[in-house]
Amino acid sequence: MVLSASLARPAKPKSQRKAAPKPMAAMRKRKKETTRQRQRRRAMELRAAREAKQVRPEMLIVPEDNLTVQELADMLSVESSEIIKSLFFKGIIATVTQTLDMNTIETVAEEFGVPVLQDDVEEAAKKTVEMIEEADKEHLIRRPPVVTVMGHVDHGKTSLLDAIRKARVAAGEAGGITQHIGAYQVEIDHNDEARKLTFLDTPGHEAFTAMRARGTKVTDVAVLVVAADDGVRPQTLEAISHARAAEVPIVVAINKIDKEGASPDRVKQELSEQNLLAEDWGGDVVMVPVSAIKGENIDKLLEMLLLVTEVEDLQANPDRLARGTVIEAHLDKAKGPVATLLVQNGTLKTGDVVAAGPVLGKVRAMVDDNRQRLKEAGPSFAVEALGFSEVPTAGDEFEVYPDEKSARAVVGDRASDARATRLAQQMASRRVSLTAMSGQANEGELKELNLILKADVQGSVEAILGSLEQLPKDEVQVRVLLSAPGEVTETDVDLAAASGAVIVGFNTSMASGAKKAADATGVDVRDYDVIYKLLEDIQLAMEGLLEPELVEEALGEAEVRAVFTIGKSAVAGCYVTTGKLQRNCKVRVHRGSQVVYDGDLDSLRRNKDDVKEVATGFECGVGTDRFANWEDGDRIEAFKMVTQRRKLTT
């Protein structure tokens, strides 16, 4: 009893006791709202609170690493289930944690009436002024201007650079197209002082839009080359838009003034329509008529470039670790990964530890555009560097770190981000449109052309992929299983053999053993050095997958001049006026403006003999099993149905 008393809870005083709830009243209160009703009420309250709190944005700004389904739903102020439902009807099975690519985000956002802007679009177009830090300002010196040469294909950009460098390098380029960006530095006399200019040569073909955009990212002035005998062309307009997006001054080089039909004034007039008004017409745009072939006015053009960039106050700090941009990169069979680097701040030295995007490197050797080995390269200097662990991506910024440990830490984070981006891209490449499939269900299975793409440099890979995106995809899909710079390897051949793919190489070679493997497995390997031919052949291959179509092929015409009744049937006596008539061909019988018969020609006779055909200028008798109502003056149109290769339609 003592133990029991010690453990018992003491009774509360009466003043502190609570009144016991009435059990029946509580039961009646619970019965008023069921579980389902309570859940529905809470959902409505949450939805109302969300709608009151969040307003759908006027514009959706997407970060560079894209968005998950849940993040997109939050930014659009909608339920994630709405996004998943929208994706399902587009043939994409997604979860709330799945990362969406940019194209998918744009499509979904447009359904909800919200336009999309990628966060890095504006940033990528502008010069990388962030290369200069606050600590650099006490050590700044003048640096050489970086000049981008832009314009329409075949307007003479490479020839102009050739004239500037006094070296004949332009003649050997396939199809007149510069296949990847080159960087060159020249030294000129300006006011009795040696001054330098660094030139970036961006390819002129419209397929290389991405490379031109990278060129303007690092440039201080754009030289717009326009042929005096051709005028403003589509790529000219594109180059103007890139230069304006980069907010860099434009100097126009009106090239080929030596050619017959050259009209610099016509070029100025066409450019004025694009709000580029020449100085001698009262505007502020420097326009210099030049002849790259004859070397006319090249010195004047260089002078103008220096004058235009003097007001820009271009500076950099050479006494710091280097920073800059990867202009181009490729895999060399003997040297390994090779990158063309433009130093924008600091000084790059042999032995420096470099991080370029997710790629780590230690500079083993550097050469300039004349293949001279260098120990260091200062601001605005372009070099070809060896020593990267893998091929960096053209357009990535690079930075030198004091030691390998700190560089590895940065590269590791970037590599994780790059892997996530690749996974998102792979998910996008596997998408199949349910709408497209249902629309083609009656015409057979969806056709695909599998490709493996290898090219000399990353810039070429991007350009070709961009061009493939422009091909019609309504009936045949192009699926790129692998795209990378470098030579064609046995692994590529194995992948092609397993997937039924064609290997397309652009300015690249085959590794040892790859050709033998391709021959043994029957894999088709195509190599090209001109992008036009590559795209043309791929389009022909896509058309080869289409079912041929039946089309009419005209044979001839005849005129009915007499009608002979034989029992229940009739025979028309005809005169062949053009072409020929063939037995068992198709005919249309025209009577005035009407077609009274459209079908087979069953009998064809000449002088009571059955014949296979009757040529122009001869008489014959014709008959059909399904038509006997012939009349004098009827016109017979003869034709046959033939199969024809179909063309892709946009």
From Swiss-Prot:
One of its GO terms (molecular function) is translation initiation factor activity. Keywords: Cytoplasm, GTP-binding, Initiation factor, Nucleotide-binding, Protein biosynthesis. Residues 255-258 are annotated as: G4. Residues 291-293 are annotated as: G5. It comes from the Bacteria. Residues 176-180 are annotated as: G2. GO terms for cellular component: cytosol. Its main location: cytoplasm. One of the essential components for the initiation of protein synthesis. Protects formylmethionyl-tRNA from spontaneous hydrolysis and promotes its binding to the 30S ribosomal subunits. Also involved in the hydrolysis of GTP during the formation of the 70S ribosomal complex. GTP binds at residues 151-158, 201-205, 255-258. The keyword Cytoplasm applies. Residues 11-20, 27-40 have a biased composition (Basic residues). Residues 1-40 are annotated as: Disordered. This is Translation initiation factor IF-2. The keyword rRNA-binding does not apply. Residues 151-158 are annotated as: G1. SUPFAM superfamilies: Initiation factor IF2/eIF5b, domain 3, P-loop containing nucleoside triphosphate hydrolases, Translation proteins. Residues 142-314 form the tr-type G domain. Belongs to the TRAFAC class translation factor GTPase superfamily. Classic translation factor GTPase family. IF-2 subfamily. Residues 201-204 are annotated as: G3.
